[in-house]
A protein has these predicted regions:
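Glycosyltransferase specificity loop/lid
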Residues: 1-476
Length: 476
């Protein structure tokens, strides 16, 4: 029986992107690979994962997708029921054919996949779309091995966590928010803390990172699970080659505006500040105005992604002069990989979601980190302290937001005085591309995983032959 891997991402832009790229990479290694998407995404956006195949299942929201759910909790509840049934039906339909699945790789938040896989007798491997460091914190906190420090000691002095398994000491504010408390999304916090609770030392867990970037944390994780970094799962030119003209994951759930690239073409090399806070976060009107005024004060041309739902947060007329003169461009969504690859971009103001952080590192773009919640505070800490590839904005304690002066300071620190961070970002770009190039650290880890799935398929074949249940048309 030939190996056939079923890849199951969470149906959101930030989770789909790396797993689509992973499916492509796995299929390029000669392993039959099928990526699962939802009926809604298949109908409205489409997914190109070639040479991997794509199948659609129900998530219980076939007409409107995630946006049609009343809440995150309601979406996940319906998705668990509908997707479990739909995925099981897909597996069963393939079981008696030469295309039966021999392994499942699933987003580590999609924990409903595990009982489906067990009932089908198929090994299931979690794929983390977060950094190794954030994943480690969630695992160690969830298992009671690492304590989050209190807000303040009795004398008012802050305390730090102890170093543990490759993790450095951290302030409470640097922890991923779900490790501190559930906040407004208790169901997501619960999923975060138990992502790898079932994994033992010999169980595979795949990470969208690369060994050179997080070597100490990865070494620590290997004491608890078979952790392997197989990223960055980003469409990248390999080391020593130029960029490609069109860079895309192949799963655009939003609609990027091509005007971005034409506008960037008119700007000098390294002159533009690119601003985007991802596909989920909403800043609010006051924070949006502070960022806008900070950008204007810094004086660099800027390209800012403001989603349609957030356009009303921008004060009326504030950026009219800048946009009319060509000093600023506001778009609802951008082709981010192409923007980061453009020579005009000199820095990236980012919320430090993991995809955005890893993309910036992989394209050598220094960052201004304005983290908001979940994994972002820890990513921002590492951008500044562990990787020296950017500066971290400090939130004003009284105002509870990033003020315009701090935004201006950070942009100037990177754009005007950022030789060191540009050099560090360039180093990480080179190492990221080397990691996924033939023989690189991530490429070797992916080869190791390919050996695992092929060996498992061979063992399943032997068992089926011994039981006299060889499927028609199967191949060794």
């Amino acid at each position: 029986m030939a190996a056939h891997v079923l890849v199951v991402p969470f149906p959101g832009q930030g989770h789909m992107n790396p797993m689509v790229q992973f499916a492509k990479a796995l299929a390029s290694k000669g392993v039959a690979t099928t990526l699962v998407t939802t009926h809604f995404i298949a109908r409205t956006a489409g997914v190109d994962a070639a040479p991997a195949k794509v199948e659609a299942i129900s998530d219980g929201h076939d007409e409107g997708g995630f946006a049609s759910a009343a809440s995150v909790g309601e979406y996940l509840e319906k998705q668990t029921v509908a997707s479990s049934t739909s995925l099981a039906a897909l597996i069963e339909a393939r079981a008696a054919s030469s295309e039966s699945f021999t392994c499942i790789v699933y987003d580590s938040y999609e924990q409903w996949v595990l009982p489906v896989a067990r009932r089908a007798g198929i090994p299931a491997v979690p794929f983390s779309t977060q950094s190794c460091a954030v994943s480690a914190v969630y695992h160690y906190v969830g298992q009671g091995m690492l304590a989050v420090p209190p807000e303040r000691e009795e004398d008012g002095v802050g305390v730090r966590s102890e170093a543990f398994e490759g993790l450095r000491e951290m302030d409470r504010s640097e922890f991923p928010s779900f490790a501190i408390g559930p906040g407004p999304y208790p169901v997501l916090a619960e999923l975060a803390l138990k992502q790898f609770a079932r994994e033992g030392k010999d169980d595979w867990v795949l990470f969208n990172s690369f060994e050179e970037l997080e070597s100490e944390v990865l070494t620590g994780l290997k004491n608890h699970m078979k952790a392997r970094a197989i990223g960055p799962c980003i469409p990248l030119p390999t080391a020593g080659t130029g960029t490609v003209s069109r860079i895309t994951y192949g799963a655009n759930l939003l609609n990027p505006e091509d005007a971005c690239i034409k506008w960037l073409d008119t700007k000098a090399s390294g002159s533009v500040a690119y601003v985007s806070f991802g596909s989920f976060a909403s800043l609010g009107a006051a924070q949006t105005e502070e960022i806008a005024r900070g950008l204007l004060a810094a004086g660099n041309p800027f390209l800012w992604v403001i989603r349609a739902a957030d356009e009303s947060n921008l004060p009326l007329g504030l950026l009219d002069e800048a946009t009319a003169s060509g000093a600023a461009l506001i778009v609802r969504w951008s082709p981010q990989l192409e923007v980061l690859a453009h020579p005009a971009v000199g820095c990236f103001l980012t919320h430090c979601g993991w995809n955005s952080t890893l993309e910036a590192l992989s394209f050598g773009v220094p960052m201004v980190a304005l983290s908001l919640w979940t994994d972002q505070p820890m990513n921002a800490r590492n951008v500044e302290r562990a990787w020296a590839a950017g500066v971290r904005a400090r939130r004003d304690a009284a105002a509870g937001m990033f003020l315009r002066g701090e935004v201006e300071r950070c942009v100037r620190a990177v754009m005007d005085d950022g030789d060191a961070v540009r050099e560090a970002a360039g180093k990480w770009r080179d190492q990221a591309r080397a990691a996924v190039a033939p023989g690189g650290s991530s490429d070797r880890s992916l080869d190791e995983f390919v050996e695992f799935v092929r060996a498992g398929a061979a063992e399943k074949w032997k068992a089926m032959v011994l039981e006299g249940s060889e499927p028609a048309g199967s191949e060794m």
